């Protein structure tokens, strides 16, 4: 199934200009947080334009939302709280201004204690929630490895393991079976955890020791075992800390159960309850998630200025502006859009997850022959989900009309800026990071 997008309606008019300005301001703010190399003094983003070429979107699957999308944000309650806020806004003048001000990170209370744990032993920076057309990223910083060989007995039938079988109920209890579309036939189930969420049986990829790791496995394991007891050394009595590997996790459970019989741990540990789990939204039959293949090769534009420092005749003697104009890019990725109550969650998948999900039917791209038209050989299409595959950039140095370019760091500056653009996109939009629209 394909979708026709009225690109002019989305990007044109005053609303389109406002969206472009928000994106420009967001990218500019992110560049101000980046540690610049010594030869660059500053980077400024001046303009952003969507261009006239729309992306190509193809629906690949319709299924249940990912478990992470059900996690509650304590600063922004669910629809019952939203209705109460709307009533209060109608009754109290100026209440809407206070609610809008809450989207400004400088006006919001600290959320260090409310940061989402992604099962990686570190807290990522919290995002911002924005009213209606504004967005909120949920961004963990890193993606460590974790392995899991089998399900614990208490995890069978857990709502956080949609593919796990519930005793006595064939096929499990998920309200929508992920094997219902043909695209899942090409999934081996041993590629990534997201393949299990989007089409493979859970126990298959859990039993495969060679499965690549993503944070979804640890995320689901933590959600399913939040009621178990963990052991914390007396020298570190932080109840919020928890084991970061399966070995430590299982060892803690074994010692916890042994301590219940002996009254004390033989290693001098004290038994403390694990951190309370995040409150999860209740699942509804109306919840839906759409998996799409997004391709774009257009004339999107962005203008940046990087100030290059000259070290002659002395270090950092003078700065010369280098203007970079991004005039287009090529994009290929798999996007997820989930609608749960009054929230729409959006993200892209990493190349490994995307290839495991929808890459099985697009690997062959015809035959190619040599110059004499002989020796045909198959041509493999590039792996799906490569995200930002190519960025077109033009550079201008100093004032116009000089006609000379004598700086040696121009290539380094271009490479640095483009790499940061890629990194900003991957950090903000690639799962397990996602954005939330309040609709």
UniProtKB/Swiss-Prot annotation:
Choose one Gene Ontology CC annotation of this protein and give it: ERMES complex
For this UniProt entry, the molecular function terms from Gene Ontology, in alphabetical order, are: lipid binding
Query: Residues annotated as region Disordered?
Result: 65-165, 229-284
Presence of the UniProt keyword Membrane in the record: yes
Where found? Answer: Mitochondrion outer membrane; Endoplasmic reticulum membrane
In what residue span(s) does the SMP-LTD domain sit? 1-439
> What's the protein's topology in the membrane?
Peripheral membrane protein
- PROSITE patterns linked: SMP
Basic and acidic residues compositional bias: what residue ranges? Answer: 109-121
Where do Acidic residues bias regions lie? 69-90
Q: Which UniProt keywords apply?
A: Endoplasmic reticulum, Lipid transport, Lipid-binding, Membrane, Mitochondrion, Mitochondrion outer membrane, Transport
Q: CDD domains, alphabetically?
A: SMP_Mdm12
Chief localisation class: mitochondrion
GO terms, biological process: mitochondrial genome maintenance; mitochondrion-endoplasmic reticulum membrane tethering; phospholipid transport; protein insertion into mitochondrial outer membrane
User: Could you tell me which InterPro entries the record lists for this protein?
Assistant: Mdm12, SMP_LBD
UniProt feature, compositional bias: Polar residues: 229-243
Q: Which family does it belong to?
A: Belongs to the MDM12 family.
Q: What is known of its domains?
A: The SMP-LTD domain is a barrel-like domain that can bind various types of glycerophospholipids in its interior and mediate their transfer between two adjacent bilayers.
HAMAP family referenced in this protein's UniProt entry, alphabetically: Mdm12
Summarizing the function annotation, the protein's role is: Component of the ERMES/MDM complex, which serves as a molecular tether to connect the endoplasmic reticulum (ER) and mitochondria. Components of this complex are involved in the control of mitochondrial shape and protein biogenesis, and function in nonvesicular lipid trafficking between the ER and mitochondria. mdm12 is required for the interaction of the ER-resident membrane protein MMM1 and the outer mitochondrial membrane-resident beta-barrel protein MDM10.
- What is known about its subunit structure? Component of the ER-mitochondria encounter structure (ERMES) or MDM complex, composed of MMM1, MDM10, mdm12 and MDM34. A MMM1 homodimer associates with one molecule of mdm12 on each side in a pairwise head-to-tail manner, and the SMP-LTD domains of MMM1 and mdm12 generate a continuous hydrophobic tunnel for phospholipid trafficking.
Q: What is this protein called?
A: Mitochondrial distribution and morphology protein 12
Q: What is the lineage of its organism?
A: Eukaryota, Fungi, Dikarya, Ascomycota, Pezizomycotina
Gene this protein is translated from: mdm12
